[in-house]
Amino acid sequence: MAIELLTPFTKVELEPEIKEKKRKQVGILGGNFNPVHNAHLIVADQVRQQLGLDQVLLMPEYQPPHVDKKETIPEHHRLKMLELAIEGIEGLAIETIELERKGISYTYDTMKILTEKNPDTDYYFIIGADMVDYLPKWYRIDELVDLVQFVGVQRPRYKAGTSYPVIWVDVPLMDISSSMVRDFMAQGRKPNFLLPQPVLDYIEKEGLY
């Protein structure tokens, strides 16, 4: 398997396969996970399989650095839902560094800590196609690209290009979002099959959304 590294200007083949490297290969999928849903899990699992990664860490943020701050629920609920969602799924785990650090979750700060803590690990930071366009605005992006390899995931009806190095991965298109799940709940509609059943059971038990 060869992996394409795409920018608007270049198209090159990366060989050998990532999994043949001796260093540990770890993907990171960050997000608010408010709540986690099946599209999150499919993305994490497909990236892990297609790139031959050792594992993918789902990393809940404490406070997103966006200007339009998200309204979110307490982190212990989001963390518990993640634990329920990945239980028994091979190759998926949770990274809680941003919840532990608290404050605004800048990716550069987080990855600086992780790379220093785990010098034998190569990190692959997974983002949606919509976020690729915003890479030039990311905090300390030119230093961040030295710490991680970005992995772009195609999203329905969205195409992106960037001059930054991004490995593109195709996954089954599922137009599901956390806001969709919350809207369903607010309307009294059960979001069946949009998220793992244990997560839905937890939401109903705790009266979330």
Can you describe what each PLM-predicted range is?
Residues 1-209:
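Nucleotidyltransferase catalytic core that binds NTPs
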